Curated annotation (Swiss-Prot):
Name of the encoding gene: CSLA11
E.C. number(s) listed in UniProt: 2.4.1.32
Protein name (record): Probable glucomannan 4-beta-mannosyltransferase 11
Membrane topology per record: Multi-pass membrane protein
PANTHER family for the chain: GLUCOMANNAN 4-BETA-MANNOSYLTRANSFERASE 11-RELATED (PTHR32044:SF54), GLUCOMANNAN 4-BETA-MANNOSYLTRANSFERASE 9 (PTHR32044)
Family the entry assigns: Belongs to the glycosyltransferase 2 family. Plant cellulose synthase-like A subfamily.
Subcellular location: Golgi apparatus membrane
TM region positions: 284-304, 321-341, 400-420, 421-441
GO molecular function: glucomannan 4-beta-mannosyltransferase activity
Catalytic activity: GDP-mannose + (glucomannan)n = GDP + (glucomannan)n+1
UniProt keywords, alphabetically: Cell wall biogenesis/degradation, Glycosyltransferase, Golgi apparatus, Membrane, Transferase, Transmembrane, Transmembrane helix
Listed GO CC annotations: Golgi membrane
Length: 443
């Protein structure tokens, strides 16, 4: 883009930056400020704040912040609606209806806790300009609070593995992967061709990506461009997030399988990749297998000595995932064993969410905004965050405790009566469940 500066601002495409938010008291200034500091000609940039807040105080604060940047010459719009239908997808859909959006060629989307670097557009938009077959440029995430507690370290490892093993490989092999919902730049024409945002599931980002991919568009994941974000540091918030991230894809798989099969625009190999690898294996089978095998079948097998589970089957998958994780997050290598155990704990919630999504149960469209702490992370204001009076009791998670106690009993039985050393793994897995059960894994 630097070579185009001499040609004047008109050579730059119009870019819309969307920031959906809902009562984001702690982080709204960070995201709005970062968006307004993006290096791009002011007359070719529109910042659209989609504020679904219901708290009048926060609404006033957001309006004031938008007004502050408007006085500095930023073309910033603060858009609100009189309902929250469709949650984030509904807000994005409503935001696209404004007339000024039609003047834009590309749309960058950032959640309220994301802070792009000033050169973000300069490093991503050229991919779309010079590759007309591209619909999406996705950047990776980096985390401002990864070292906050053990749980945030575990999340960093999981997400780094996701970006390396799923996003980067999908981009390289098939030019397709799931949009992460933020830190990406879309081509408006591709979005419109695929039908725009839909609120039929809680994973509107994945829904849009699949539909755009089925229209023959390609995606690219840019590993060396990263956007700062915040990880949930409270276990309850993390569980709600994981429920949404597992329930939504399963529900989308239920709704889109036949649509993918009937599609005539892409090859059968790409359809097979989307149905089998992207959805069936990664979004459904992996959760079921992880929880039922490692947290139920394997522990229960100690009561049935005639059942012989091959050692390789219990070691191969954890070993390979651990190897990939060590490559993705080398500084956390010493935590990989507990990370595998923690992933097994979370597999319980992911399995439940997947069942609800496949069966369209009562919580299938549940959307709980992930709680964020924003500046409190850097200014050491955490003690001022309100805590429940019965702090310890509030932290107890009964499901994790029950599973942990069951695996503990299995481990003890194997130690006393068994002829294998399976109890070593079972004791460690039970400890991981109990640590999560008493709430000692987050802030």
């Amino acid at each position: 883009m630097q070579e185009d500066l001499e040609l004047g601002n008109q050579n730059f495409p119009m870019v819309l930056v969307q920031i959906p938010m809902y009562n984001e008291r702690e982080v709204f200034k960070l995201s709005i400020g970062a968006a307004c500091r993006l290096i791009w000609p002011l007359d070719r940039l529109i910042v659209q704040v989609l504020d679904d807040s219901t708290d009048p105080t926060i609404m006033e604060m957001v309006s004031t912040e938008c007004g502050k940047w408007a006085t500095k010459g930023i073309n910033i719009k603060c858009e609100r609606r009189d309902n929250r239908n469709g949650y984030k997808a509904g807000a994005l859909k409503q935001g696209m209806r404004h007339s000024y959006v039609k003047t834009c060629t590309y749309i960058a989307i950032f959640d309220a806790d994301f802070q792009p670097e000033p050169d973000y557009l300069e490093r991503t938009v050229p991919f779309l300009i010079h590759n007309p077959e591209l619909a999406l440029v996705q950047a990776r995430w980096k985390f401002v609070n990864a070292k906050k507690c053990l749980m945030t370290r575990m999340q960093e490892m999981s997400l780094n593995y996701h970006f390396t093993a799923e996003q980067e490989s999908g981009s390289t092999r098939h030019a397709f992967f799931g949009f992460n919902g933020t830190a990406g730049v879309w081509r408006l024409a591709a979005m419109e061709e695929a039908g725009g945002w839909k609120d039929r599931t809680t994973v509107e980002d994945m829904d849009l990506a699949v539909r755009v991919g089925l229209h023959g568009w390609k995606f690219v994941f840019v590993n060396d461009v990263s956007v700062k974000s915040e990880l949930p540091s409270q276990f309850k918030a993390f569980r709600f997030q994981q429920h949404r991230w597992s329930c939504g894809p399963a529900n989308l798989f239920r709704k889109m399988t036949m649509e993918i099969i009937r599609n005539k625009r892409v090859t059968i190999w790409k359809k097979l990749y989307v149905i089998y690898s992207f959805f069936f294996v990664r979004k459904i089978i992996v959760h079921f297998f992880t929880f039922f095998f490692y947290c139920f079948i394997l522990p229960t097998s100690v009561f049935f000595p005639e059942v012989n589970i091959p050692t390789w089957s219990t070691v191969y998958f954890p070993f390979m995932i651990t190897l990939f994780n060590a490559i993705a997050t080398p500084r956390s290598f010493y935590l990989v064993i507990f990370w595998v155990l923690f992933e097994n704990v979370m597999a319980m919630h992911r399995t439940k969410g997947t069942f609800i999504g496949l069966l369209e149960g009562g919580r299938v469209n549940e959307w709980v905004v992930t709680e964020k702490l924003g500046d409190a992370l850097e200014t050491k204001l955490l003690p001022q965050v309100r805590k429940p009076r019965n702090g310890f009791l509030e932290r107890i998670n009964s499901k994790e405790m029950m599973v942990g106690i069951y695996i503990l009993c299995c481990a003890s039985y194997n130690l006393v009566f068994g002829k294998t050393v399976l109890y070593i793994y079972l004791y460690m897995q039970a400890l991981a469940f109990i640590i999560a059960g008493i709430g000692f894994i987050g802030t």
